[in-house]
Amino acid sequence: MMSEQDLADVVQIAVEELSPGHPVVLENHVVTDEDEPALKRQRLEINCQDPSIKSFLYSINQTICLRLDSIEAKLQALEATCKSLEEKLDLVTNKQHSPIQVPMVAGSPLGATQTCNKVRCVVPQTTVILNSDRQNAVVAKMEDPLSGRAPEPLENVISNAVPGRRQNTIVVKVPGQEDSHNEDGESGSEASDSVSNCGQSGSQNIGNNVTLITLNSEEDYPNGTWLGDENNPEMRVRCAIIPSDMLHISTNCRTAEKMALTLLDYLFHREVQAVSNLSGQGKHGKKQLDPLTIYGIRCHLFYKFGITESDWYRIKQSIDSKCRTAWRRKQRGQSLAVKSFSRRTPSSSSYGASETMMSTPPPSSELQQPPPQALHYALANAQQVQIHQIGEDGQVQVGHLHIAQVPQGEQVQITQDSEGNLQIHHVGQDGQVLQGAQLIAVASSDPAATGVDGSPLQGSDIQVQYVQLAPVTDHTAAAQAADALQPTLQPEMQLEHGAIQIQ
């Protein structure tokens, strides 16, 4: 074993070889007083035969190798996990890697944009999860020849994500930003395949591109009809369209596109169309049309006309174009009223004979030549007014107003202006609308309510989109009110979709 002095000399020699121009002297190296540098000593090999150092170096080497192997194994596991998550995400979002090309031809006769440009059309697979009050959901896939992956993993995701859903739940693709098509900055029609919660508060998002929604039932609109196949709980949506109107639509709409745009006017007010589109995106900050209602239109077209996904994509472009047209008309200050609703006389079968309406009619001259400004219809005591008000989400909410005690000489009027908007006013004895006064009516969500036990509504008028007069349930009060009216002038009044018709 070398001594300490020999080891120091060897190190000094090695240092001098590294920097021959500037010799470095170690602290423990003794330098002679002579001017000439000392002769270099011969390099000595360090041959350490100590087994303890070898074992120590070997253990360090083994530790480093094991650490590297562990890191490599973790990286491989992470890569496998990423691939698995990517496959699951593709399965959930029904992502297609080879989108087809379809021509967008022949817009709607009601004003949709016509173009012959080619557009990208991603036809997603739609997976419907049906849960009819059972413990385990039944997965039913709609026919899609472009994808054959099984949706079993999705069922577990749905079961864990939505523990409290009721009736039917639909899972469909909601496109991301890259799937939106930029026409005037706000097309993005792929989003109409998404489904949101219509009137419910239980919709949840599994991921960025998947939305869960509970389908509605017949109890939501007992007087309405089904969109789609009423015998297939996976392909139907309940709507507020009455049977007579649905028959009228089916009779007059001979093409799928015309029926889709007609249903759009029945289900969404033009004001809602003007501030909305299918995707809820765009430079104007528009809201999304209720996806459940759009899904109902889709089911109805598939059921009635047997359209394909490519046809549905083209129809969605026409729906977006119709919304843009309504937005432009609103920006220009033009009327948004649906003229066909005013020209069409609804069938008397829409309401039963027992639904006798009590009202004071306007003069006959007013019926023959309606004034351009407004039409007025007075309501009597104990009259019940049924209000269908459209919310911001495009859904029709049904409420009732029970006309209470109207002071002598005063009355409650329904006013329809030239734009088709309806209002309810409290009019005084001088014929002027009482500003800031209490409307002589109370609101109720129970159609069977007969008493006037609620608090009066504040304000001089109520803005509504649809109004129809419901049957009088309090016959005693109705008889008293009838004595004050002219018995020969009590025609049946039908107010439907913003247009008041007198028969």
Swiss-Prot record:
GO terms for molecular function: DNA binding. Residues 160-350 are annotated as: Interaction with CUX1 and HDAC1. MAPK1/MAPK3-mediated phosphorylation at Thr-345 and Thr-360 results in export to the cytoplasm. Residues 234-330 form the BEN domain. The keyword Ion transport does not apply. The keyword Cytoplasm applies. Keywords: Acetylation, Cell cycle, Chromatin regulator, Coiled coil, Cytoplasm, Developmental protein, DNA-binding, Isopeptide bond, Nucleus, Phosphoprotein, Repressor, RNA-binding, Transcription, Transcription regulation, Ubl conjugation. This is Protein BANP. It comes from Bos taurus.
